[in-house]
């Protein structure tokens, strides 16, 4: 009995009458009345007061800061928010008509309640009138208050009471608070009615009616949308679907997602079915709030500051949930006491205990669900913050070297930076590789964000541990502290394991970065790798790194085993120590009630121990990832906003010196003074490596400015510039040497955020010679260019990049060698019609080029560079007279400077894919066919059984899986025997023995015997369970090793067609995210699933065996369990797949930003790209958000079902109390306690397994792709001995639906013959190389080399027998030697010989270099070139070399192997004409007996060859000596020579060659 003053609160088994009258009917309602009235009055008065003051001018939501800071203007999210809102519209999810009708019903119930009060008050007996008047009057006033509140809520729609809208939500809150409180107060009186404690009929009717009305009002309000909340959505698409308006019931039980789950059950979901996010969860709002709350400094304090409200809410919910979770354990001793002696307590009281268990678990489940969902929502928001900050940093990060070394501690230092780098290359100057940067976003950001989920679990674990220990102390006394000390002793072991685990994790991340970098490099260069037959080389390099990862995974598995053993054995050890101390030192009797209550508490303690251990492990990983993110955010940023000076009259340099890096060997531009002519064409020329590209990058502010000044028209953001009357802005547009395109349509790439003007667009297309290409494409300007433009030819990519600059509103254009990728005819057309045409009116253009004769014709200003210095500048006509280099270059270009008229209505050609359809000879139909494949397909339905079987086969088959599952059944049987052993111990009565331990050991059954046996059973069970997990993980690691090797082999040896139509990012997703899932998540989840299923089956069978009546509850509960699980699994599967697909665009945008950051910054378009990233993040967040809501939806329902299992078990136990002993009842309740958690775990793990199995499906899909057909007849070792090549009736198409790239091609090349292959872009030239290398399967025909049909020769043997110099110079991360001779087949003398021949080192230095290899002393030997020694670092893609230098190094690589056949694909396009002439001379002199097939746009390069093969539309049109063809006016070759602008020179060279060979 609990007393308060003179009024007892509880009498025997019910609430006392005076307590009901004083507290339930008076004091508590009075408190509700006063708090509700004060709160409502304050809110209404405030709203009325503000309305009267008519505060219509609201303060701006965000204050502008740093208005003079151009960098702030470009990157501040606060500045973006207003622009975002102006482009979108606000859609408000209004209340339904039915919700409005419910308010009238609510008012009617309140009136009814007042009527009932008046009726009872008027009919109350006089002797009770004074007391009852007090309580009734309070309740009447409370209902009058609620009537006023509902009235105000109803009249808020009236124009006369619009001020009420401001406090409508507060009024709604008062109503809900009152209804919920009143219903809660009515529960105990209603119980008194049911058990017959209240006899008065009027009071019985009153209590029943009051409870019913309170419940009805509560249900009405809980199921109606929350008033006063403008649940609005900032959307870009009017058709975007909105979720149902939130209700209290929907928020608490997650029923708000019911419609989406039901829709997913009926059919597969698509992106269009996913509801939009509300404004508060939009990325722009999240980032704006984060930016306002953040201070300069480290990321972690800012994250804590921003999410402090979430943390506090989770802390409170964890406290409530943790306490309520122990209510069943507190009530368990009373239930077991009743089972032990049914007469000790009344049935009413025991039924109250059982009901209290049900209610407490439901409330605890609700609090836990809300706490976890807050964490999951925080995960989404933190992920948004991290990804956005990383993306924004990428747009600010410097392109220069040594911006960081945090991810690559062992990275080598480059010998010199690229003086003539292209767009893709400058961005790679950082020593952090782009793929490592991508890991920061794709892996580290996700790991850190997942830590938000752990905060609630960590708080819950702490509270549960403390509460459990307090209850244990009250139950066992000070012996509970013995167990506590044992528990604390395990914490250092946990931290020791966590420390080792974290160290291994950090080492693994380094290897993962290295592996993904290697894979990305291989994928980006797959065509060259196949041409060089280096698949095995790259396969072995990647596998070696992977082996290191596998070793670390196994070490982590061992640490996990130790940690797992501690987790499982901990409760056994703690309970054994506690019981021993309790019996021996406290001399207490251990009863079943005490023992099984303590065991239930120890079982509950296992959960927080698990959570603490897993939380520590996850937090360590998260902190490691956070440090990596912090390191990235701390990297140096571009200084362009500081070093560029704005000027309206000057554009250029004033005594400026610039460099790539602060190193002696770094390339420098020295004392540059150039004043470019405004509204004119300015040309920059110079030999290869002179610094032309670096000069342009310096003008853009991308290099380090050592001294001097750089003047540009503006440094403001593109959005802030005013458009002039001519439609132009004072901004710059940049077109890089290597074209940079975004994934999207041709229109997207050209318009690039500008306003679309059809006439202007058509004019730009025509001037850039793209109009014919567009017409040839089925989709026209809507043709998707693919990943990096891989569906287009190199020429088309360059022209689209140029068109983007021309179409822009920029008045200043900076073009880096944009004419080298097109044939001479197209180059001349673009120069005349575009660069010197009407599109350039009022514009200033700066262009670099090797085509000196072309660009100098109409240039107004010419700058000549050499070795980073301006040698001369001025008008071209003046410089030609005085500059020897210029005069020599023009003479080499053309002795006839008068070009012939060309047909401006020329036809352009079709496309070329990035890696495989080299010149794009496949038709535009193929483009459209490929475009259909650009979007990643979403798997539908459940994961196929074939995927499970495929994975099981790697484990050894389904038999191994069966054995593994059977072992789980046996092991848990051992675990259950612990409880039965304890029951047996207690039944023996030995616990009360007073004999000495030594004597009883001799005699037999002593306490120590039982305790030691109990410990042994627990240890064996824990060891076997942990060992099973360890075996599973180790086996899984071996399986993932095999799967990775299979996947890598499948990708590397796949047909080139696969790489053409599959974006690199999609393939990388398999190697990174999907492989990481199989490595670290899938197998542990499989093991956890099997264990949880076994546990649940054991529990159900145990309870059903002891109390068969339980099966009556079990059947409907299982049916309900199955139903909700089925609904959830289908919905979660669809949402997860959409989430996986929607993440890819974020990776794509990030990869594009890395490659194109120079172009983006030049256009001052950072703000638009940040906005695009936010849109992509929102599209990814939507399915992620609703997936988490669906997860909590199922968790809540499974918890409720588990609570019902506990409740039904308890009911069965008290009903069969006379037939059960307390020990058996304790075993049943202990297991029933764990059923909820285990059942919930099954759903989570099973859904996780199915979701994770989608990664297996995706990987399996890529292991089944067709590989290249291999030959089976090995030719002789010296094949090809002579070099005869013959094509017979060869036809080739790149896809079944495309036109023929080669159509019945036949020609023969004799050994030692040099053949030039010419023709317009897309004529089929590069398809010949593709056919000879068998990069694509032929439709028909044969290719004979030295009397061998190459179709039957093994691919590696074939490709190793032919040398090739591809059009795109591809180098790999390593050294000069590893790029030239990765297999160490050649000596230094041979390597220096080819370097000398291609002009990378001077001939006089060759012997010096060889002698210095033994004792290098480069300080005393000054080189003119950048190659210090053969171990000089070459970065991935050759990014630290100029385009020309890369091409020369590739030429040296092909010349190193003495092969009898060489294929050259436009290998000198990026080299100046003088160097080109020298290289061609070298080729002719050193390869006299080699058969050479050269594709060339520069006709001068092949005019003295033995034969010219003219291709057109995939057919051979002409094949003869150059002189023969050029002498015939009717030949295509004659027309090509005429259109080149140097006909007379070509004719003379051809004639000399012809005469020399007669």
From Swiss-Prot:
Domain ABC transporter as annotated: residue spans: 651-892, 1285-1538
Annotated transmembrane regions: 30-50, 104-124, 131-151, 170-190, 202-222, 303-323, 352-374, 450-470, 482-504, 559-579, 585-605, 954-974, 1014-1034, 1083-1105, 1110-1132, 1200-1220, 1223-1243
Keywords: ATP-binding, Glycoprotein, Membrane, Nucleotide-binding, Repeat, Transmembrane, Transmembrane helix, Transport
InterPro entries linked: AAA+_ATPase, ABC1_TM_dom, ABC1_TM_sf, ABC_transporter-like_ATP-bd, ABC_transporter-like_CS, ABC_transporter_C-like, P-loop_NTPase
SUPFAM superfamilies assigned: ABC transporter transmembrane region, P-loop containing nucleoside triphosphate hydrolases
Extracellular side: 1-29, 125-130, 191-201, 324-351, 471-481, 580-584, 975-1013, 1106-1109, 1221-1222
Membrane topology summary: Multi-pass membrane protein
Residues that carry a glycan: 4
Record localization: Membrane
Record bears the keyword Transport: yes
Binding-site residues for ATP, renumbered to this chain: 686-693, 1319-1326
A GO cellular component entry from the record: fungal-type vacuole membrane
Compositional bias per record (Basic and acidic residues), positions renumbered to this chain: 424-434
Domain ABC transmembrane type-1: 311-621, 961-1251
Covalent S-S links between cysteines: none
Subcellular location, principal: membrane
Topological domain spans for side Cytoplasmic: 51-103, 152-169, 223-302, 375-449, 505-558, 606-953, 1035-1082, 1133-1199, 1244-1558
Positions of the UniProt region annotated as Disordered: 410-434, 892-926
Polar residues: bias regions: 892-901
UniProt-listed Pfam families: ABC_membrane, ABC_tran
PANTHER family: ABC TRANSPORTER ATP-BINDING PROTEIN_PERMEASE VMR1-RELATED, ATP-BINDING CASSETTE SUB-FAMILY C
Similarity comment text for this entry: Belongs to the ABC transporter superfamily. ABCC family. Conjugate transporter (TC 3.A.1.208) subfamily.
Designated name of the protein: ABC transporter NFT1
